[in-house]
Amino acid sequence: MEAALEVASNLRPEDRREVEEGHGTNPLGYLIREARRGTCVYFTMPNGKTAGMAGIEDEGVVWMLCTPAIHDYPITFAREAKRFIDSRQEELLWNIVDERNTVHLKLLKFLGFKFLRRIIHGPNKLSFIEFARVQRKRSKRSC
């Protein structure tokens, strides 16, 4: 719960704008709800700052909200995010992202997501990009 409060009160402006303008949702309420569900993780950087939270909702809907701390250790953050995504068992991970959120677009590309199409979404009818990643099947090794 503490991480949810920290992330919500320190969101990157682009992330706050995406949640509020694009989805019509209060970031604090959303993060607290997800923290209570227990379906999320948070990322802490070497300087002790919380860089963000991420989670997987029903049907493989993946989400992430970040603080400016991601810019302090961008490589560390990207590797931690990749570890999280690669650890997931869902066959398909997907969602939409505000096309103005260029940092997240770059991260999604690094994480192996493919951009599918532009859609108009939310109360302000903003342009979002649908993205998805089909998880690689892990082969079982035998002796």
For each predicted feature, which ranges?
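A short, internal acetyl-CoA/4′-phosphopantetheine-binding micro-motif in the GNAT/acyltransferase core
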Residues: 63-79
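Short amphipathic alpha-helix that is part of the acyltransferase structural core
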Residues: 1-25
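C-terminal "cap" of GNAT-fold acetyltransferases
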Residues: 121-143
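Charged interaction scaffolds used for protein-protein
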Residues: 37, 45-46, 59, 137-143
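Conserved beta-strand in the GNAT
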Residues: 42, 46-63
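Conserved acyl-CoA
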Residues: 79-93, 102, 111-113
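Active-site rim helix/loop that mediates acceptor-substrate recognition in acyltransferases
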Residues: 19-39
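Conserved beta-strand-loop-alpha-helix junction that forms the acyl-donor binding cleft
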Residues: 93-109, 120-124
